[in-house]
């Protein structure tokens, strides 16, 4: 059975403390036992579940809400102090409780108590319960105190470890920062050196670039003359053509043969020599040379035809009749 003891003050005797004990099996809503004492006398009553339901119906309240209001009024620590008012009459042995709302109050319940014949026994049980409760609370308090001390020691230990971790972290960060600064300075130095080397290479390329362009552009007039001049094959073609023309002229313009009786072998050898003149490969002549040859070609052909006719007449004149029939 669970019980709760509280100290209350009656509205009729505000300076006299009374002690109210409420005990129940399962819950207050299933019924409870109420005991009231002033230290000399004791009164008690048993409230059933049916009576609780009737009180809730009389007040037009839900049963659950009514039970909550009873718990707040009878069990200490459940409601606000000074909100509820207790009334008791020793003559009528009627006990009632009311709830105050500003200027208005309404009755929560009323019970008819019976005076206990052996009040000392009731008071003794009440005192024993209070002492047991105090002892239990003290033991619980001591246990909580020890637990609090243990947690405090653990907290101090954790705090010490945490401070060590923070110190180690700060030292590690400082060391890593110093190493980072060293590496960063090395990288900066290397980048500066590479940048300087790159600038030197670019300046060297810019200085050597005009020197590379000058040999191609600064050619002497003699070199241009060499490139403008004709090759050996081109210059040799007019020379060979002139020699060929000169040889042809010499053949056609040579004096007539004065031998009156040439032998057959000489004539054949001469004709053979004339017919076996080496042939020259045609070569392309310059434009001016072609024009000169074209202008002189008719005159040359005319002279060649005249020379051929004279030579044929002279040959016929000097030849003998025997040669003609040979």
Swiss-Prot record:
GO biological process, one term: negative regulation of protection from non-homologous end joining at telomere
Annotated effect of mutating residue 53 to A: In 9A mutant; abolished phosphorylation by PRKDC; does not affect ability to repair double-strand breaks (DSBs), possibly because of redundancy with NHEJ1/XLF phosphorylation sites
Per UniProt, location of the Glycyl lysine isopeptide (Lys-Gly) (interchain with G-Cter in ubiquitin) cross-link in this chain: 290
Modified residues (Phosphoserine): 53, 193, 230, 235, 250, 254, 295-296, 307, 312, 319-320
InterPro entries reported for this sequence: DNA_repair_prot_XRCC4, XRCC4-like_C, XRCC4-like_N_sf, XRCC4_C, XRCC4_CC, XRCC4_N, XRCC4_N_sf
GO molecular-function term, one example from the UniProt record: DNA binding
Keywords: Chromosome, Coiled coil, Cytoplasm, DNA damage, DNA recombination, DNA repair, DNA-binding, Isopeptide bond, Nucleus, Phosphoprotein, Ubl conjugation
GO cellular component: chromosome, telomeric region; cytoplasm; DNA-dependent protein kinase-DNA ligase 4 complex; ERCC4-ERCC1 complex; nonhomologous end joining complex; site of double-strand break
Chain segments annotated as coiled-coil in the UniProt record: 131-165, 185-209
Modified residue annotations for Phosphothreonine: 231, 244, 315
Consequence of gene disruption: Mice show growth defects, premature senescence, IR sensitivity, and inability to support V(D)J recombination. XRCC4 deficiency causes late embryonic lethality accompanied by defective lymphogenesis and defective neurogenesis manifested by extensive apoptotic death of newly generated postmitotic neuronal cells.
PTM-bearing positions, type Phosphotyrosine: 227
Processing after translation: Phosphorylated by PRKDC at the C-terminus in response to DNA damage; Ser-254 and Ser-312 constitute the main phosphorylation sites. Phosphorylation by PRKDC at the C-terminus of XRCC4 and NHEJ1/XLF are highly redundant and regulate ability of the XRCC4-NHEJ1/XLF subcomplex to bridge DNA. Phosphorylation by PRKDC does not prevent interaction with NHEJ1/XLF but disrupts ability to bridge DNA and promotes detachment from DNA. Phosphorylation at Ser-319 and Ser-320 by PRKDC promotes recognition by the SCF(FBXW7) complex and subsequent ubiquitination via 'Lys-63'-linked ubiquitin.
Outcome after substituting residue 307 to A: In 9A mutant; abolished phosphorylation by PRKDC; does not affect ability to repair double-strand breaks (DSBs), possibly because of redundancy with NHEJ1/XLF phosphorylation sites
Residue span of region Disordered: 203-326
Region feature Interaction with IFFO1, mapped onto this chain: 1-212
Bias type Polar residues, positions: 307-326
Motif interval(s): Nuclear localization signal: 264-269
UniProt biased composition (Basic and acidic residues): 206-226
Subcellular location: Nucleus; Chromosome
Protein name as annotated: DNA repair protein XRCC4
Organism listed in the record: Mus musculus
Lineage of source species: Eukaryota, Metazoa, Chordata, Craniata, Vertebrata
